[in-house]
C-alpha cells in the first residue's frame, strides 16, 4: 500500500481551534483569585491550609491552560495573512504569556482582570480572521 504525500498547514484540523478554552481558563483564574482573597488572613487550621493550597494549585493550572491554548492557536493557526491583518498578535500573545505568569506568581486580582481582557482581545482577533462577528458584554 502506497501512501500519497499530503500537505497540511497545521498538526490538527483547524476546526479544533477555539479561544474559548483560554477565555474560560482566564475567567477561572479570576474566580480562584477571588476565592483566595476570601480566605482568612491567618491560616489557623489544616483544613484552611489544604483549601488554600488547592485554590492556589487550581489558579496556577488554569493560568497554564491559558498559556497552552494561546500558544497553540498563535503557533499553529496564525499565518502570514492573519499576521499582516493583525500585526499586534505577536505582542498580544507574548503579553498574555507574561500576564498569565504574573497570575501564577501573585494573588493580585488586577492581574487576572488584565489576563481576561487580553485573552478576550486575542479571541476577538481570532474570530475576525474567520470573519465571525463578536461582541463584548460587561458582566453585572
For every predicted segment, state its role.
Residues 52-67:
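Alpha-helical segments in soluble extracytoplasmic regions
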Amino acid at each position: 500500500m502506497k501512501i500519497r504525500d499530503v500537505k497540511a498547514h497545521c498538526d490538527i484540523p483547524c476546526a479544533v481551534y477555539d479561544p474559548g478554552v483560554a477565555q474560560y481558563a482566564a475567567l477561572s483564574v479570576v474566580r480562584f483569585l477571588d476565592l483566595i482573597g476570601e480566605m482568612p488572613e491567618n491560616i489557623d487550621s489544616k483544613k484552611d491550609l489544604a483549601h488554600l493550597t488547592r485554590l492556589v494549585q487550581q489558579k496556577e493550572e488554569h493560568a497554564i491552560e491559558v498559556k497552552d491554548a494561546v500558544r497553540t492557536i498563535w503557533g499553529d493557526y496564525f499565518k502570514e495573512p492573519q499576521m499582516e491583518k493583525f500585526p499586534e498578535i505577536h505582542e498580544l500573545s507574548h503579553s498574555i504569556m507574561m500576564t498569565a505568569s504574573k497570575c501564577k506568581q501573585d494573588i493580585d486580582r488586577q492581574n487576572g482582570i488584565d489576563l481576561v481582557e487580553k485573552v478576550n482581545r486575542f479571541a476577538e482577533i481570532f474570530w475576525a480572521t474567520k470573519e465571525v462577528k463578536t461582541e463584548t458584554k460587561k458582566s453585572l
